[in-house]
Amino acid sequence: MLSRSGSQGRRCLATLSQIAYQRNDDDEEEAARERRRRARQERLRQKQEEESLGQVTDQVEAHVQNSAPDEESKPATANAQVEGDEEAALLERLARREERRQKRLQEALERQKEFDPTITDGSLSVPSRRMQNNSAENETAEGEEKGESRSGRYEMEETEVVITSYQKNSYQDAEDKKKEEKEEEEEEEKLKGGNLGENQIKDEKIKKDKEPKEEVKNFLDRKKGFTEVKAQNGEFMTHKLKQTENAFSPSRSGGRASGDKEAEGAPQVEAGKRLEELRRRRGETESEEFEKLKQKQQEAALELEELKKKREERRKVLEEEEQRRKQEEADRKAREEEEKRRLKEEIERRRAEAAEKRQKMPEDGLSEDKKPFKCFTPKGSSLKIEERAEFLNKSVQKSGVKSTHQAAVVSKIDSRLEQYTNAIEGTKASKPMKPAASDLPVPAEGVRNIKSMWEKGSVFSSPSASGTPNKETAGLKVGVSSRINEWLTKSPDGNKSPAPKPSDLRPGDVSGKRNLWEKQSVDKVTSPTKV
């Protein structure tokens, strides 16, 4: 309910403001119409005065020309006809206006019924009756007096303003006003055209009047006896004309002209002020709208610049991130390459160090006095085999090879042993056979025992003597077995314990040992199946 009452109050205020504006506009239009009507009346009065002056002059000169009364009667009838036509046109215009207003009233009532069905014809019958009464009074007042018609028209305009408060659309009123203005302009043009015709008639009449006057003057000049009469008539005519001018000009035209000028000047000044005010307001509104548009354009330009800056910053950030990522990727690759190269160099260095250690350990591992005795034979094949077996055993212990790979290692050692034995046999076969010493046992049993140990996989167990011990070779066998045990039991990083030096060997026995090794090689050649 409150919202409805508030909306109705706003509507009432809007309608009141609209009514006030329309009333002001209608007042201005009515004042303009009144000014035009007064101007027309003033022109008609001036015409009548001129015609009356012309009639007086024609009556004075009636003794000169008898055709003057006929010519004077024509303008009077023309003026009467013009006045009758103007009154008829005014009445027709008022009738048309009344019909249009009644139509608008009916349309307004229908619209109001559509918006508010509670309104009945009886509630609005009073304004319609009042309008009808006012229209009737207007018609009678226009017929009787023009002043009363003005008041009647004001009342009609007031009723129209009251009725237009119920209207929602003023487009039809604007069209009607435009039509009325066009009709008034056409009527004014017609009046102007009539005035032009009247002016032409007057000019022709003046010309016709001048011609007989000139003829009269010539006739009087011919007659010398009428000079005094001419002077008296001239003085009488001028005196009479002056009296008529004084009678018409101060009494009628003077006061009316001044009053009309004042009445016409005040509305014109007010209209000019209103026009200036409207122009000023329109200029202010246009300037405000222009400023708002300019401000909006500036704000849009600023927003566009900010968006461009943000986009540029985002692009720069993305480029920096991409460059940083590429740099990190390049650094990572460089570090990986450096790490690989360093590891490779470390591996190569360790391999070189291991090779050097392997080369130095058999020679430098023992001191000078603890080095085992080496029998210098022509070829030294048995010592080489022992050194090779020792090297293979060390490599197996260092690399931590499991027992599952022992068979492959043994097969490799066997193949190497076979290669070495074959090489020894090849070298010995080319030499002549020498008689072997009968007192030395065959040392091939120890080699066979070592081979059988590698084949059986019992290298890590203590060797068992399969052959019968001899007193002469006991020291040699003890030295070999002790060295094998040391190879098997010592740690990879531990120092080599010196092998016991056999006490029964002396430098003088070199030749005997030589014969022993030669006998051993001969036995190997003769009995290849045992190997």
From Swiss-Prot:
Gene that encodes it: Cald1
Native species: Rattus norvegicus (Rat)
Protein name according to UniProt: Non-muscle caldesmon
Tissue specificity comment: High-molecular-weight caldesmon (h-caldesmon) is predominantly expressed in smooth muscles, whereas low-molecular-weight caldesmon (l-caldesmon) is widely distributed in non-muscle tissues and cells. Not expressed in skeletal muscle or heart.
A GO molecular function held by the record: calmodulin binding
Compositionally biased intervals (Polar residues): 54-68, 120-133, 162-172, 459-471
UniProt free text on domains: The N-terminal part seems to be a myosin/calmodulin-binding domain, and the C-terminal a tropomyosin/actin/calmodulin-binding domain. These two domains are separated by a central helical region in the smooth-muscle form.
Family named by the database record: Belongs to the caldesmon family.
Alphabetical keyword list: Actin-binding, Calmodulin-binding, Cytoplasm, Cytoskeleton, Isopeptide bond, Muscle protein, Phosphoprotein, Ubl conjugation
Chain positions found as Phosphothreonine: 468
Protein's UniProt keywords contain Cytoplasm: yes
Positions of the UniProt region annotated as Myosin and calmodulin-binding: 20-200
Organism phylogeny: Eukaryota, Metazoa, Chordata, Craniata, Vertebrata
InterPro entries: Caldesmon, Caldesmon_LSP
Effect the entry attributes to changing residue 468 to A: Decreases phosphorylation-dependent actin binding
Domain of life: Eukaryota
Cross-link (Glycyl lysine isopeptide (Lys-Gly) (interchain with G-Cter in SUMO2)): 384
Region (Strong actin-binding): 392-424
